[in-house]
Every structure is written in structure tokens, then in C-alpha cells.
Amino acid sequence: MNLCSSGATASTTSLSSTGQAERSGGVPGGGAEGGGGGGGSGNSGGGGKTSDVSAEASTLCFAGGSGTAGAITGTDELSNANSPANGAGGASGSTGSAQQPTGSNGHSHLHNENNANMPPETRPKMVTVKHPESNKPKPTTKKSKPIQADQDVIKALQRCRDEGIKRLDLSKSSITVIPSTVKECVHLTELYLYSNKIGQLPPEIGCLVSLRNLALNENSLTSLPESLQNCSQLKVLDLRHNKLAEIPSVIYRLRSLTTLYLRFNRITAVADDLRQLVNLTMLSLRENKIRELGSAIGALVNLTTLDVSHNHLEHLPEDIGNCVNLSALDLQHNELLDIPDSIGNLKSLVRLGMRYNRLSSVPATLKNCKSMDEFNVEGNGITQLPDGMLASLSGLTTITLSRNQFASYPTGGPAQFTNVYSINLEHNRIDKIPYGIFSRAKGLTKLNMKENMLTALPLDIGTWVNMVELNLATNALQKLPDDIMNLQNLEILILSNNMLKKIPNTIGNLRRLRILDLEENRIEVLPHEIGLLHELQRLILQTNQITMLPRSIGHLGNLTHLSVSENNLQFLPEEIGSLESLENLYINQNPGLEKLPFELALCQNLKYLNIDKCPLSTIPPEIQAGGPSLVLQWLKMHSPYRQIDCYYQYELQTVNQAPGAGGNGGGGAAAAGGSASRSSDRR
């Protein structure tokens, strides 16, 4: 029996208001990931623009149920560069009504006229809605319950058949079944069914021989019908986020495919028949359970993007070297023990993801991949790189070697960092930064050496003049060299968890510094020059041995976060009241801190104040428990400045009540001005 024969003609009742939407200026959506049509009339979502029932390209966008149809768009989390543009749909209310009165469920005005002949008890209730753009009341029917999605699909398919629509979007519509009448939509070139509840496709899907794009992502598919092989023009097939335990065999017979998404399924193996898909340029097998990638991958010589990340691969076949057009190869989050030497054949490679595997080395042939701009092997067990490899990759701008077993910098000298602006060597076993290693790295702005074994910094640190972010946390540094003053472009300096006892006075030269983190060191005194860091926003000093803050701290007008908890503070300077931008203040666990300065109440932007485990004898416990606002209010109420203000208020009242006194307005302004002036002087 021919599944694609027309058979009996189905009912041609169409969604009239949606049809009107297409004839009244809908804008067609575009792209393989799908979007809705333009704004339609009434409350029903508009489809793409058509010219009545013509042979031109047309679109039907369906949003499921009655009521206003929202925009329907598709997303591609894998590769925006390889995904077609998304369309967009819309809906309008009163605009469509002005052109042709419609009901909220898409029926024409003729149906509303028929309601007049209905018995009163069955007649739809009429309500009046006043639209903001018009004072004239407009009648509309009370919204009924949404029509079953599967019933609306039948109507949409009928219209698709009758109008020769080429692009049909039924996404996000709670569809469970695609009816067999889909076979009649022979003009379709794009069909979007993503984000539904479809468990299987009907065999009649194979009748859509003109289909080029088929989006089935985010459903519950476990298989595909064999008849799909009749769709011999299919180029884009999206099966992401389904329940496929294997790649359906029919896919291997779709030799016209150029883009195949199989991400986030339950696939455990890839058959040798994969070699038949010679036209593939993009293949995503990300987030499955694949343990082996066979030699068939080498037959896909047109591949430009291959994503097999987040699987269980232990090895790659040597045949991967045949995919000479690859520009992006993502292998991260697998269990790879090695990379084949043939990787060096991929001279077009720009991005190679090897993060979080079990690699102990990388092949020297990687130096042939000179188009790479990023080298990232984070989260492996690598102890050293092949000699001169990084220097050969002269286009590198970012190098990430963090979370490995490096005991020293890669061999290759200063030449390997010539064009690099970011280096990350966090969490290794490196005990020194070689002198002059960054002498050619004129563009280096970011260096992360956190969690290593550094005991000192190189004598030429003063030459790192373009450095913007320097992270030296969790090492064993005992001293910060005076030459740090030359890093005048520095904005972020992180020195937490070291063994520093003092900070050099030259720190004041870092006028662009926004973040200074000195947590968990052995610092007893801060230099007065800290007050020169006028751009500073975060100052973290917790867990040190600081007994007092310098009065110059009051000059840090941009400071929003100050943490001095777990120190030996005896008092806070009055100048802390000048920190008008301060939002968070941590002074908890200072066992000698018994009182707070009244000037703290001048920090009007303070949102968080932690005074836990401070023996504040002057502030009642119930006030302390009430949070920063209550503490600040208490400080205001008990401030000596308040007594001065009260005196002036009393004086003002006396003057205003005196016989022949001037108007209240003038006296009030003068007194308030005087009080404000004194307040300003205090600040």
C-alpha cells in the first residue's frame, strides 16, 4: 500500500483568523532552528506572509490551543556559527480586530453572528473590554478552554495542504501524535516539531520528499520510521534531547545530510555505516554514553565541526587525521588516555577541546596546527609539553594548563608567549616563575598562578607593565617586591593565602586597582599609602593580624566591600564614616573590638554589617541582632552630633516662636543650612 496516496479528502475547515493574519502583513520567519510567523489579526498567532494560495514560499506557525499565540523560536546550544537564523513569531490583539472582527479562538465574525440564533442558555457570554488605545467598548467572547493540541494539528495540516505551505512550525505545542494526514503536506521543505511530547513519528513522514530541515529535538523519540529514507533531500536533522539508545539505522541512509545533531541521548555506540554520510559538515554526539569512535569517522572528510564531548571515550582512531577540514574538535570531558599523532594532519584546526580527560602528554605533531588561537588542557595529568610546541603555535592568544602536574614552566623560552594575553597555570606544582619568561609577552594582561608552590616572585616583575589581573593566591610568598609599583595598569591583585607579613609602601602607585585581596596572610600593619588607591572597590583583609586600620582608609571613596574580620582590631578609625559607597562591612571575630565609631552611621549605603563575636559592650545585644540598619540607627541616636543638631533645632523653635520673628521658611532654611554645614564639616 502506498502511504503517500491522497485517499479521501479531509475536511478543509481552516483557522480563518490565522489565514487572515497571513494575508494582512505577516512576516515570514526563517532559519533551520525555526521561528514563528509575523503578527496576525485577532488573538491568534500569525503565520508567515503569503499571497492568498499561491506557489510562493509560505509559512504556518502554530502555537497550540486558543488565545494569543506567542513567538516560537528554536535554539542551538552547540554551535551558533553553524545553525541557521531563528525566526520569530508574534501576535496582536486589537490590530487584527480592526481589520476583521474575530473571536478569541480563531473563528470568523460569521460564527459570532450565528450565536444570535442560539438559545440563551447555550449562547457564549459577552463581556466588554476597554482597550487603552480607544474609548469605544469592544465586545469579545469569554475565553473558552484551549482546544486539544492534537486536534489543532489536524487543522494546521489541512491548511498546510490546501495552501501549499512550505514551512510549518508546530513546536512547543504539547503535541503527542503526528496524524497520518501529514503525508498530504508534500510542499513542505521545513518542519519544526521541537519541544513537544512526541513518542514516535508516523510512517507517512516519509512522504515529505521535499523536506530539507527537520527539527525533532526535545521530544521522547526512541526510534525513527524506515520510511524517512525517502526524504532524500534532507540536509538538517536535529534529534537533540530525545531517548535514543542507538543511532537509528535509517539515518545512515540519509546521504544528503550536512548537519546532524544527536546531543543528549542515550547512544552507546556508533556503527560503521556512519561512513556513508560523506556530506556531513557538522556532527554533534555530545553528552551520550559512547565508549568508542570507530574508524568510520575518517570517511567524513567534509566535517568542519565534530563534537564528541561528555562521553566515555578512552581513545581516538588514527583515522581522525583524515578529517582535514576540521576547524573545531571538541573532546573535553571524556576519559581519553592519549591523542593520536595523526591529529597533526588537522592543519585547519582553530579550536581543540581537551579539557578534563586522563591525558599524561600530548603529541608533538600538534605543533602543525598553526591556526589554533587557544590551547586548553585543563584537568588532565600532564607533566610537560613537547619542546617548543607552544612556540610553534604562534597564533595562540590564550593558554590554559591549569589542574595538571606541571612542576615547571613549559620549555620553549619567552618566544612561546609572544602573542599571548592570558596564561592560566592554576593548581600545579610550579615553584618559580623563570626570570625573563615574559620578556616578549608585551600583550600579557592576565596571569593566574593560584595554588602552586611559589616562594618568591622574579626580579623582573616590574617589567610586566601591561598586566591587568594577577592572581598569586595560595602559594608560599613571604614578600612582595617594591617593583610591584610599576604595574600601573593592574586592576585586580589577589595575594590571599600566602605568608606575607607586610605590604610595601609602593602599593600606592597602583592607581587603577579595583580589587585587592590579602586574605589569610600574616599582615600586622597596612601602609598609609593604601589611601591612594582611589579606584579601589573591594578590600579583603580578613584572617590576618591587623591591629588598626590607617586613617587614610577614609580616602577610598569608591570602596563598596571591606572585610577586616578575624583580625586583632582594637577600634575602627573615625574616617570610616567617609566611605560613602560602602555597602558591605565585615568586622566580625575581632576579640578586642569593644565599640564602633559614631561616624559609621554616616555610611548611608551600608547594606550588610557583620559584627558577630565582637565584644561590643556599648551596643545592646538586641540592637546588634537587629541588623545593620538598627545598629546604624542606634549610633545615630546616641551620637554626640545628634545633641548638637537637637540644640540647633531647639534654637530654631525658640526663634520662630519669638514675637516679631520672621517667617518660618527663612529661619528654617538658615538653621537647616547651618546644621547641614556642620554635618558636612564632620564628614
From Swiss-Prot:
InterPro entries recorded: Leu-rich_rpt, Leu-rich_rpt_typical-subtyp, LRR-SigEffector_domain, LRR_dom_sf, LRR_R13L4/SHOC2-like
Keyword set includes Repeat: yes
Gly residues composition-biased segments: 26-49, 661-671
Highest taxon in the source lineage: Eukaryota
Coiled coil regions, renumbered to chain: none
Span list, region Disordered: 1-54, 74-150, 661-683
Gene3D superfamilies cross-referenced by the UniProt entry: Ribonuclease Inhibitor (3.80.10.10)
This protein's UniProt keywords: Leucine-rich repeat, Repeat
Biased segments, Polar residues type: 99-117
PROSITE patterns named among the record's database cross-references: LRR (PS51450)
Repeat as UniProt keyword: yes
One family name in Pfam for this protein: LRR_1
Signal peptide per UniProt: none
Renumbered ranges of LRR repeats: 164-185, 187-208, 210-231, 233-254, 256-277, 279-300, 302-323, 325-346, 348-370, 371-392, 395-416, 419-440, 443-464, 466-487, 489-510, 512-533, 535-556, 558-579, 581-603, 605-626
UniProt biased composition (Low complexity): 1-19, 74-86, 672-683
Family: Belongs to the SHOC2 family.
Function noted in UniProt: Acts as a Ras effector and participates in MAPK pathway activation. Probably acts as a regulatory subunit of protein phosphatase that specifically dephosphorylates Raf kinase and stimulate Raf activity at specialized signaling complexes upon Ras activation.
Protein name according to UniProt: Leucine-rich repeat protein soc-2 homolog
Gene source species: Drosophila sechellia (Fruit fly)
UniProt gene name: Sur-8
